[in-house]
Amino acid sequence: MNIIQGNLVGTGLKIGIVVGRFNEFITSKLLSGAEDTLIRHGVESNDIDVAWVPGAFEIPFAAKKMAETKKYDAVITLGTVIRGATTHYDYVCNEAAKGIAQAGTATGVPVIFGIVTTETIEQAIERAGTKAGNKGADCAVSAIEMANLNRSFE
């Protein structure tokens, strides 16, 4: 049996990151976690490009555009959606998730889902580097692994 898996060495990888500006006090921490983790795994800082968009709903569009350039070995998406009093949360979360998944499958470039979806602002803060770790850092590790896995299929 052959086991195919990606390693966690970022040397030589070019990574795109799309970040939603809405709830920027949280998404900026997700971005810092992602950048720090990428660099610690060997990705050069000048091989990381960041595109800011208004919010989570716009992330799939920019992620797909980045992936279509074929300049990136992986694209990380980072955003925060916090439930409010209306159904807006459900629409944004569902469409962002679908769009991010489609961006990866349509382009053949790994597109990593890093939208923090929570019931409360406290839960979002916890996932941006406090009690529950940093989702941006987790996504960076996934991006490195998937980029290397994708290379193994070429």
Swiss-Prot record:
This is 6,7-dimethyl-8-ribityllumazine synthase. Its EC number is 2.5.1.78. Keywords: Riboflavin biosynthesis, Transferase. 5-amino-6-(D-ribitylamino)uracil binds at residues 22, 56-58, 80-82, 113. The keyword Transferase applies. Forms an icosahedral capsid composed of 60 subunits, arranged as a dodecamer of pentamers. Belongs to the DMRL synthase family. It catalyses: (2S)-2-hydroxy-3-oxobutyl phosphate + 5-amino-6-(D-ribitylamino)uracil = 6,7-dimethyl-8-(1-D-ribityl)lumazine + phosphate + 2 H2O + H(+). Pfam families: DMRL_synthase. The active site is at residue 88. It comes from Bacillus amyloliquefaciens (Bacillus velezensis). Signal peptide: none annotated. GO terms for biological process: riboflavin biosynthetic process. GO terms for molecular function: 6,7-dimethyl-8-ribityllumazine synthase activity. It comes from the Bacteria. The lineage of its organism: Bacteria, Bacillati, Bacillota, Bacilli, Bacillales. Pathway: Cofactor biosynthesis; riboflavin biosynthesis; riboflavin from 2-hydroxy-3-oxobutyl phosphate and 5-amino-6-(D-ribitylamino)uracil: step 1/2. Gene3D superfamilies: Lumazine/riboflavin synthase. Catalyzes the formation of 6,7-dimethyl-8-ribityllumazine by condensation of 5-amino-6-(D-ribitylamino)uracil with 3,4-dihydroxy-2-butanone 4-phosphate. This is the penultimate step in the biosynthesis of riboflavin. GO terms for cellular component: cytosol; riboflavin synthase complex. InterPro entries: LS, LS/RS, LS/RS_sf. (2S)-2-hydroxy-3-oxobutyl phosphate binds at residues 85-86, 127.
